[in-house]
UniProtKB/Swiss-Prot annotation:
The lineage of its organism: Bacteria, Pseudomonadati, Pseudomonadota, Gammaproteobacteria, Pseudomonadales. It is an enzyme of class 1 (oxidoreductase). PANTHER family: D-AMINO ACID DEHYDROGENASE (PTHR13847:SF280), SARCOSINE DEHYDROGENASE-RELATED (PTHR13847). FAD binds at residues 3-17. This is D-amino acid dehydrogenase 1. Its EC number is 1.4.99.-. InterPro entries: DadA, FAD-dep_OxRdtase, FAD/NAD-bd_sf. It comes from Pseudomonas putida (strain ATCC 47054 / DSM 6125 / CFBP 8728 / NCIMB 11950 / KT2440). NCBIfam families: PRK00711.1. The keyword Oxidoreductase applies.
């Protein structure tokens, strides 16, 4: 059976690999010159299932108002003329309640934990190397209020069976020795020992080679025009003016997914969250992070690769603008300079931006559609790397008619129809 996958980021490439293992004939098409050239190119590098949380959380609307007045705010909104932007923000606000947050976080943790297990299995089976570290993630709290507010997340971690440690200042210094010199700036931390790090682009490129060895064909530099349908079936995809036909189709185009789906009558509530990163050469390994640090105040991640530090964060709701904002670089430099002042050479840092495909509830869209041969694997937001292997494995099982190892409930696009019905009946807008 022939499958055409649109998109060669980490999600599309992993999907291709797992489908090829199931015996499918797979073709991957992308407009770029190689895999992982857009959102997967220079992300924060963290594989952090336990920290999988929706931006749409209780209290976020009030925080967003305060953030608008702050120079180094983690979230910024740049109004555009697009109705999609306002529609998406309204949907996000409807999810900012305790009931929705609990449901959405459970779904995100479910797919993320499974994804980490799939990544472990894949690494053991293939020996793929991507500067991986299995040393956990440490979320830093600068105030006691942040420590106290972590209680709701800890409750969900307990419910999901995710191991964690609450650290005081001494514990922080033990877990991340380079932070000993700045311990007085910190009130505590939440550490998840099973989290990992790794270079997403390196992983994707190497996995693409492994997929090719399984027979996957990658076609780069192609313009994907539109999907053609006939009744409840996708009959082909127009690529560079030519109709390409397959038995099944997978759309993994990230933030650009809605553009392809809207003409088909599928409303995918995905909007780009613009993020930034710095890649910094390490000058003193003893003064650099050991694994991944999350600064709760600035929502910035600092990740250790072999000889580099990757600093990533920010979320701009600004449409498809890919210009580099110097103020965002200032924020990233502020955070890494504050916590690891002697770890790397900021004068040699590389500044990058990418668009994360975010859903209003934070959960990716993985699974079937109203078209019998069209499947989606998109909308992973800031956690595409974390969720990629689990999403790809889940999708491959569904397409092969196998029972997945985790529940797929609430992960496909039909949940938004249920959410709309719940809202119309006056119930909380949880994507049930």
């Amino acid at each position: 059976m022939r499958v055409l996958i649109l998109g060669s980021g980490v999600v599309g490439t992993v999907s291709a690999y797992y489908l090829a293992r199931e015996g499918f004939e797979v073709v991957v098409v992308d407009r770029q010159d190689g895999p992982a050239m857009e959102t997967s190119f220079a992300n924060a590098g963290q594989v952090s299932p336990g920290y999988a949380s929706p931006w749409s959380a209780p209290g976020v609307p009030l925080k967003a108002i305060r953030w608008m007045l702050q120079q180094h705010a983690p979230l910024a909104i740049k109004p555009t003329s697009s109705l999609d932007q306002y529609r998406w923000m309204i949907q996000m606000l409807r999810n900012c309640n305790p009931a929705s947050y609990a449901v959405n976080k459970e779904r995100m943790v479910r797919i993320s934990e499974y994804s980490r297990d799939c990544l472990d299995e894949l690494r053991a089976e293939t020996g793929i190397s991507y500067e991986a570290r299995q040393l956990g993630t440490t979320q830093l709290f600068r105030t006691q209020a942040q420590v106290d507010n972590a209680a709701k997340d800890i409750a969900i971690l307990k419910q999901s069976g995710v191991p964690f440690e609450l650290l005081d200042r001494d514990g922080i210094a033990k877990a991340e020795p380079a932070l000993a010199s700045v311990r007085d700036k910190l009130a505590g931390a939440l550490r998840l020992p099973n989290d990992q790090t790794g270079d997403c682009q390196m992983f994707t490129r190497k996995l693409a080679k492994m997929a090719e060895e399984l027979g996957v064909e990658f076609r780069f530099g192609c313009n994907i025009d539109r999907l053609e349908c006939s009744g409840d079936t996708i009959s082909g995809v127009w690529i560079d003016g030519k109709l390409e036909v397959a038995d099944q189709y997978v759309l993994a185009l990230g933030s650009y997914s809605p553009h392809m789906l809207k003409p088909l009558g599928i409303q995918a509530p995905i909007y780009p969250l613009k993020g930034y990163s710095l890649t910094i050469p390490i000058t003193d390994a003893s003064m650099a992070p050991s694994s991944t640090i999350l600064d709760e105040t600035y929502k910035v991640a600092i990740t250790r690769f072999d000889d580099r530090i990757r600093v990533g964060g920010m979320a701009e709701i600004a449409g498809f603008d890919l210009s580099l904002n110097a103020r965002r670089r200032d924020t990233l430099e502020l955070v890494v300079g504050d916590l690891y002042p002697k770890g790397g050479d900021l004068t040699k840092a590389t500044f990058w931006t990418g668009l994360r495909p975010a859903t209003p509830d934070g959960t990716p869209i993985v699974g079937k559609t109203k078209y019998r041969n069209l499947f989606l694997n998109t909308g992973h937001g800031t956690l595409g790397w974390t969720m990629s292997c689990g999403s790809g494995r889940l999708l491959a099982d569904l397409m092969a008619g196998k029972k997945p190892k985790i529940s797929a409930k609430g992960l496909d696009i039909s949940r938004y129809s249920n959410q709309k019905e719940a809202h119309n009946h006056g119930n909380p807008a949880t994507a049930l």
